[in-house]
């Protein structure tokens, strides 16, 4: 009785955030279309992908570790000591992170060329020079993305999920508009500037500037203690997230001697990351404060129910995603990207690599929720240890497989260690909470497989038609078919989604 209303509320919040995330991904995809058309997989595109990797790694490391430590400490501080102390803690962390990342940005700009030379040994001198030029612009992402991640976590603690999604939507709109305006004539330099400006806009829109300057942030002993606790909880996360965040740097290092491979892997990785974000990010964001609250209350029944609901939701999303990417990646990439300087060979390589990254999508989605469970227990060491072991295995496999198998070997190694990590984490959670965390997952899996098979059949039929961009028509028709089959099979998540859109009709139909 307690769980179902909460699950309905979570689904509504997840749906709103997922729709906003879908808008962001749509804009990011427009940018990918422009890049594919104007630059394909040529050397300038290699330079852009290489230059953006380190800033994204650093900002992802700082934002991910600090945000994951911030949420449980902020929620606990607000509940036990008061909202004023929690507010002061948050503003102090924003100030410290601003100072640290601004200093890091300036140091990185001055060391741009030696840094790029070390990270990309396969580049010649001209490629190193060009990559360093772009890196000087893109290195500002270390500041804006890190601060944006902390601001996002702060808003999520107050349930302001739509605000953060809307801010990212506006920021991506700025990036696409500026790239569209200047990219064709100004080249990759204008693209880099557009990306940096978009990140700044996203951060600026999420901060409560008026309240900060009007309310201030009284520094007290309690708030300083909360800041120290947050930083101490963050330290193990830095090590653990370093594994995931350093993974792209290792990939760039291994592929730098292969012309075009960095760009091809970049396209596939960004598409996989977009799918991963769409499938898990909204759910993890909404569920994390609830998980932290149940853990703080030591209510294992509610915690178990929240985890089971999240796993059922992810199962319903991931099964059709895997079906689409394994069987229909090639026609999708062909219809979406193959134009301008993006060739048929690029389509073949990118689609094969994307299909091989399905393990990353599944493991990353389930791992996002699993890690949040440990963080809600204020246990950051266990995910770190698992991540270190998994990354070590993955790195060894990459060095072993890159020579005989190229990009496919790298993608397979990445998928393997992501899946290994999540299997271990879910196993440990089940040992502590019991098999109740998997309640209803098997039934959801069966329904998702049946629905995905029906959707794949419809998509295959449309691929054989003469429609323009048949894969897109097939994806749309397959999605509708999947929803219809799930409703007919009385899947609870599907019915709740229908009730959200048609509340009166859905209740009458089910009664």
Which residues fall in each region the model found?
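Membrane-embedded alpha-helical bundles of multi-pass transporters/translocases
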Residues: 2-511
